[in-house]
Amino acid sequence: MKLSRRRLLAGTGIGVAAGAGIYELVDQLAGGSPARSADLADGRGVEQHLLAGVREIVDDGVEVLVPPLHHEVVTATVQAGSLATARRELEAALAQLEARYPGTPAGLGITLAWGVPYFRRYVPRQAARLMPIDQRASQVTGRTVSALTDAVRFTSDPEETILEQNDVAILLRSDALAHIADAHRVLFAELGVFVKTSVRRGFAGGGFDGGIGLPKQMAVAAGVKGADLIPDGSELFLGFTSTQKTGLGPARIANFESLGLVTSPDGYFEGGTHMHLSHITEDVEAWYLNFAFRERAETAFRPGIDLKAGARTVPQGPDEISNAADVKETFARTGSIGHSAALQTASRLAVELIGDDGTVYPKGTAIPQRADFNTLDNPFAWSARPGVDGMAKEPAAGVHFVVFNPSSDDFARTRRAMDGELPDGTKLAITPRSRMQGFNAILRTTHRQNFLVPPRRARAFPLSELKR
């Protein structure tokens, strides 16, 4: 039975802004929180974006990371008469939450990310002096380029994609929905320093322990067209696994300082990173009705890939990836590119590198650290400006795409590669959103914004303590 958004929320007895709505079904359908190791310390280090205690499993012979079950992103503008007072109050609220929950999936992950508008409006002089600099982008353009720049529309983005201007985005992750609800209450109901602009909710994992799998069950419950076609046990609405361990950047690789791509004046932002946030709808029905399994595999990975029927988890290690020459040769031969293959031309290390802390990163190592999650928001769970954001009543399959890269430009290089615009300057002759372009034929990006994630020590109103 197809349920409207209103009916789903009415069935929970709570409102959109205060409750989780349809996402309360996650715990019922998943059968509780995933098994996690109980022998863990607090899990919090210098970085905000890293989460300790993530479960590792083997699926189809491939190591896979199982992310926290529940996710929420809240965007907001700053409402503060005194930044000094606001900083103290926010830090006290965060300390309260961290004393209550460890920084693990079983506890609570909290990541504060700050947008360009915050730095321009509240700390412009301090930002001009101390914002991290993207050395690679600066060298290419011949001018100084900040590691954080405004988001742009890409070739395959619709003209109506909204480039957002939020001051802050707060990412909350936990296996326990109650922990996220508690953090939401503390940070946005009790604390008076933010005005919410949107709430974005969703889930991850839930497809590796047998049975139908969480994405399929949730999509069916929401009445998503084509939901019954989602393969049982899938991690994502589109059927394939995306959290292969070797497909995600390891530990500190996305930190500003790790690869030498970005420098941080006076070291203020060392231990920080860049975060891109976007919402993308997925046409599940078109994906399964118009693409046979073989074409789905070639679209998701690369043309010519040989997978057994029904395979969902595909190796993505350094030996299984594609470079620019591979992608160009394949395109010349087949007229198409695969999603993963195209991305890998920019998202993987072209040579072995030694990090600032001595860590050796082999050639082919992934750089981006993704934290995206499935959603039925359309496009958000709640918006302060529903008309502008295009809020719709019916749930829609999609993803809130959250990814950590060393800089805005590093993210953009990878996203352009998805459109056939490779890092070496090659632009493949692909019609935007065509089937030749991989997933783009069935994806539509509604919103985008870039953010800077400070290290934990500077997470509360960064640079504001330097104002005089």
Predicted regions and their residues:
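N-terminal secretory signal peptides
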Residues: 1-3
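Long, histidine/aromatic-enriched segments associated with O2/redox biology
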Residues: 7-468
